[in-house]
Amino acid sequence: YVVGGMPCAISMDEMNAPVNSQRLAAVDTSINLSMDLVNNFYLPDLLAIGHIYAQKGLITGGAGLAKERVLGFGSFPEEPFAGTANGGDWFNQIMIHCNAVVENFGAGVMNAKVTEVTADDLKDPEVLTETTTHAWYKDGDALHPWDGKSEAEYTGDKNGNKSHWEQLNEKGKYSWIKTPLWRGKMAEVGPLARYIIIYTKVKQNLLQPNWAEKMMVDQVDAISKLLNVAPEVWLPSTLGRTITRGLDAQLNACMNKYFFGKLIKNIANGDTDTANTTKWDPSTWPTEEVKGVGLYEAPRGALSHWVAIKDKKCSNYQAVVPTTWNACPRDEVAGQGAFERAM
């Protein structure tokens, strides 16, 4: 399948090609500049100010759900993958194995509970669902994203005002965002979630880290030493949320350099393919109903797009984005989402 904007022709000799030697050199310069900015400006300033807060005993906050439950899907596949079926090739190729849920991190790294997110989980309607009880959509049942419905039902504020609001209808519908649940529970996603998951998995010997995951653990250990505060204390704090964004920027800058090097090596070896187009034409699609999901870790957290194809047409498409997890309205059983809890 080909996503719009992805296939850019590669030619080292053609000056008008979207990707040529001149433009690759410009990309390399930009990558090096980003690494310089993060390492020599962003992080030093961030840590200097953060250290002052720590010395003053102002590592506070800790709202949201980071102490209770965080979720991730994993990111940065090393090589092309064949999807999430057949044992989950996506999970075999990712470099950042944050495909898990960590619960009770606030009680300590070694006391936290880690549950892997697997290929089977993606198909299980008991694992991942969305509800619309407090969202402006019809049908409040908990549905798997493949079965999800998005038929609008806007009801306005508590008094039924649809243009000039007076009071939020907290007991009714009050958001355009659905409520995603993991095994019936709320979860927080984002850079902080990724760092909590990787750090916990490595420290509990559940993951043998590659160079990128080791970098994440070393980053957390270095900050813990600088602040003289345990990771389960500073990571879920307001300071920790801010710091992990900076650490994530440093990691991504290194990832840019790493994958750029792989691209240059591929081109040098004569590999200039930009996409696999075997499934581009709908005539190649099966006539029976098929379902699929695309996963990733966007900068803001766990991202998933779910599609069902029937009779060679898209019959359903649902996106459960990071903000769906963090900014969702409450659930009567699961409680409040990360944003609501923080407020």
Range-by-range predicted roles:
Residues 1-300, 310-311, 316, 321-343:
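Active-site bordering "gate/hinge" segments
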Residues 305:
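A translation/RNA-centric and nucleic-acid-associated enzymatic feature enriched
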